Amino acid sequence: MMKNLVVILGPTASGKTRLAVRLARDLKSEIVSADSRQVYRGMDIGTGKDLDEYRIDGEEIPCHLIDIVDPDYDFNVFEYQSRFYRCFEEILSRGIVPILVGGTGLYLSAVLENYRMVQVPENLDLRESLKAEPLERLQQILLEITPRIHNTTDLLDRGRLLRAIEIAQHSGRRGLRESPEHPRIEPLVFGVRWNRDLLRKRIALRLKERLSAGLIDEVKELHQSGISWDRLEFFGLEYRYVGLYLQSRMSYREMAEKLTIHICRFAKRQETWFRRMERHGIEIIWIEGDDYEALKEQLKGNLRS
């Protein structure tokens, strides 16, 4: 069956965007981002948007789902999936096979594994009525509504318990906003992988480049614009540790060292997620390093024209 979507996934610093841009130029295609942080405006260096990479030989490659919301907006996987489906169908309607590129495993899985989701709003009245209840009582309430709990960690954390009760109480009611019927997706999925030592070196080099490019100033300006330090931590490792440095809670050297260590650990977690996707039936064709010719060879005869 001919494929109608090319996917290029990989851990941070693997060079997947550069490969995707080259491919988009050769196929006259367009890129759709699968990155949970690049949706935010004004967060460029820390999220690794590398917008210059979308220009190749003087040609600008169209890209979607980048810079679409402000940092104070709570973007989520439900909204990502909905927006992706709209992008996918619109691009495909013009006779173009889109290229999905990114490393946010949850977003990739939501699309490729066809997650069926229901968006449940917070119930402030319910939360107010339960705020004085002890943990044991909240556990009892949840188990009374849904005796079979799939995620037992919901029973151990107060915040997760309240959210689980909200969702359980809404289950089966009318008026819920459900994820849209998904279009038929026939993906050809490529994964970019590197030798572990080489990937560590790439991560360290890219962090050094980002710090030189003004990462610290970016975080400082975001905070001065009204984004709290706590909120900045939500956006990931770079914003968390640079924020700690700007608050004089660690030295520059300590910040750089901790960032390198934790970004490497994050890359390992990304690789673990990709293996999980394979176990769930997603076939991934692995490309060693940035071997563009190997990627092109695998594409032959597979794409919808």
Swiss-Prot record:
Residues 35-38 are annotated as: Interaction with substrate tRNA. Keywords: ATP-binding, Magnesium, Nucleotide-binding, Transferase, tRNA processing. Pfam families: IPPT. InterPro entries: Dimethylallyltransferase, IPT, P-loop_NTPase. Its EC number is 2.5.1.75. ATP binds at G10, P11, T12, A13, S14, G15, K16, T17. GO terms for biological process: tRNA modification. It catalyses: adenosine(37) in tRNA + dimethylallyl diphosphate = N(6)-dimethylallyladenosine(37) in tRNA + diphosphate. Substrate binds at T12, A13, S14, G15, K16, T17. The record marks T104 as: Interaction with substrate tRNA. Transmembrane segments: none annotated. Its cofactor is Mg(2+). It is an enzyme of class 2 (transferase). It comes from the Bacteria. GO terms for molecular function: ATP binding; tRNA dimethylallyltransferase activity. PANTHER family: TRNA DIMETHYLALLYLTRANSFERASE. Catalyzes the transfer of a dimethylallyl group onto the adenine at position 37 in tRNAs that read codons beginning with uridine, leading to the formation of N6-(dimethylallyl)adenosine (i(6)A). HAMAP family: IPP_trans (MF_00185). Monomer. Belongs to the IPP transferase family. This is tRNA dimethylallyltransferase 1. The lineage of its organism: Bacteria, Pseudomonadati, Thermodesulfobacteriota, Syntrophia, Syntrophales. The gene is miaA1.
